[in-house]
Regions:
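Charged, low-complexity interaction regions
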Residues: 54-67
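Short, charge/polar-rich alpha-helical segments
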Residues: 24-45
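Sec/Tat signal peptide C-region and signal peptidase I cleavage site
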Residues: 17-21
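Bacterial N-terminal signal peptides
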Residues: 7-15
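The conserved beta1-alpha1 loop
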Residues: 211-215, 320
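Short substrate-entry loop that stabilizes the transition state in hydrolases
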Residues: 218-223
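Gly/Ala-rich beta-loop-alpha elbow adjacent to hydrolase catalytic centers
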Residues: 268, 288, 292, 296
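Lipolytic serine-hydrolase domain surface
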Residues: 85-204, 224-240, 244-283, 300-315, ...
Length: 439
């Protein structure tokens, strides 16, 4: 189980964690990637198919032999990803395409700045550097703050442009080419509420909030930059906001992150209560990714069970949800669909290698993974994004935030409240198990 879990950690880290994570960021992956030097994608696919047949022959009873075959399957899947993104030739191309010089002095002309507010229950480290201000330890209450992220004018939708990891050890990011977390300022609760209220009441404001919730292996700075990227790419005219729960931002911290996510459910529930009762907001849109979907889904489930009225939550977008599909179907989905005024959209894919690995480790299908069938539930729109995602990019796990066609789909939801049919998606399946695909 230890080896199997470690492989899952590496895969989820590369696909769901740090912004534009590179293989060199994932400690412990190097030896596995070196082992594919004499392999081809075809040979690995053949091995994987043979192992899957063996697993089918053995059945689902949890024996040591079954577990060994499961581990071997994970090993092969991870090696396939190594061929896609971790070979030295690919790394060299990445280095060649990025700036290797130090950031220029003075204020660069070719950038835009996005100011986003946040809530977090991470511990403060005592550091004054924006990227080191918060750690990965859990605190029992959340507090507010404000972050400023600069985005280069050369930005491409779906990207969070950063220096190559090797160069990052030597040079600072160049603001004319890279995302930069310029400032992070914790705010007193009353001060934050007043400032956010002024923002929402400003002339031309949509009085709307876009809330982003990150997944496993994400640091505070990763969440800030991803929230800024989504806001910018969607051309969202309301107030950007993100919630950063205390992910340890380490590959080997999958199990601790699961515990932190579970503990943070009540924190996010309290946050939603604060946003809806203390601010002049009319519409709230939530985009949650991977393990972050657990935090959000359970928090809203608890609100529904307590009979909390819903007058401001409009759209809930669950991106590649790493949630037990049976738990979601039996416990969470009934509560979400009962919340009047809230529409829930699930994005799933058959190319999500990270969730395939999670399914093997947990023993249950994940809501965001479709190789065993597309999750459907009456009142929830499920989008099979397999045709718009690729396992060769971030393990096929970040397509919702890094694929222009999917970002465009989200934009239609948030800005126009368009249904899947109105967005031009193609229906599949029969009632009541209808889902949608990209054309």
């Amino acid at each position: 189980m230890g080896r199997q879990l470690l492989l899952l950690l590496g895969m989820l880290a590369m696909g769901a964690g740090a912004v534009q994570a590179q293989p060199s960021q994932a400690i412990g992956e190097t030896e596995t990637c070196r082992s594919v030097a004499n392999e081809t994608l075809q040979s690995l696919q053949t091995r994987k198919a043979g192992l899957e047949q063996e697993l089918k022959r053995l059945g689902e009873r949890p024996t040591p032999t079954v577990r060994k075959v499961q581990e071997d399957i994970l090993d092969v899947v991870f090696q396939m990803e190594c061929l896609n993104v971790a070979q030295p030739t690919n790394l060299k191309r990445s280095v060649a395409k990025r700036s290797v010089g130090p950031g220029g002095g003075g204020a660069p002309k070719e950038l835009v700045e996005v100011t986003t507010y946040y809530a977090t229950n991470r511990n403060k480290t005592g550091s004054l550097e924006p990227v080191k201000l918060y750690g990965g330890n859990y605190e029992g209450n959340f507090h507010y703050g404000r972050a400023v992220v600069s985005i280069p004018k050369t930005h491409k939708p779906g990207e969070v442009e950063k220096p190559n990891p090797l160069m990052r050890l030597i040079f600072e990011p160049d603001p004319s080419k890279h995302f930069v977390l310029k400032s992070v300022e914790p705010l007193d609760m009353d001060v934050a509420r007043k400032e956010m209220a002024q923002k929402l009441n400003a002339p031309g404001s949509a009085k709307a909030i876009l809330v982003f919730v990150h997944g496993y292996n994400s640091g505070f700075n990763d969440a800030a930059m991803r929230a800024a990227q989504i806001t910018y790419d969607l051309n969202f005219q309301g107030m950007p906001f993100f919630y950063s729960w205390p992910s340890a931002a380490r590959i080997r911290a999958y199990l601790p992150d699961e515990e932190s996510a579970r503990l943070s459910e009540s924190i996010f529930e309290n946050l939603i209560e604060d946003l809806t009762t203390k601010l002049p907001v009319t519409d709230i849109y939530i985009v949650a990714h991977s393990m972050g979907t657990r935090v959000v889904s359970h928090a809203l489930q608890h609100r529904a069970e307590k009979g909390k009225p819903n007058t401001q939550l409009r759209e809930l977008l669950l991106a590649a949800p790493d949630i037990n599909a049976e738990l979601f179907r039996g416990v969470i989905a009934p509560k979400l669909t009962a919340m009047q005024g809230l529409r829930t959209t699930v994005y799933a894919s058959s190319s999500d290698l990270a969730l395939m690995a999670s399914k093997v480790v947990h023993g249950y299908q994940r809501v965001g993974e479709t190789t065993s069938g597309v999750f459907t539930y009456p009142g929830i729109e499920t989008i099979d994004a397999s045709s718009a995602s690729s396992s060769s990019r971030a393990l096929g796990h970040s397509y919702v935030v890094d694929t222009p066609s999917v970002i465009g789909d989200i934009k239609s939801i948030v800005l126009n409240h368009a249904t899947a049919k109105q967005r031009g998606l193609t229906s599949s399946g029969a009632v009541p198990n209808v889902y949608w695909k990209f054309p």
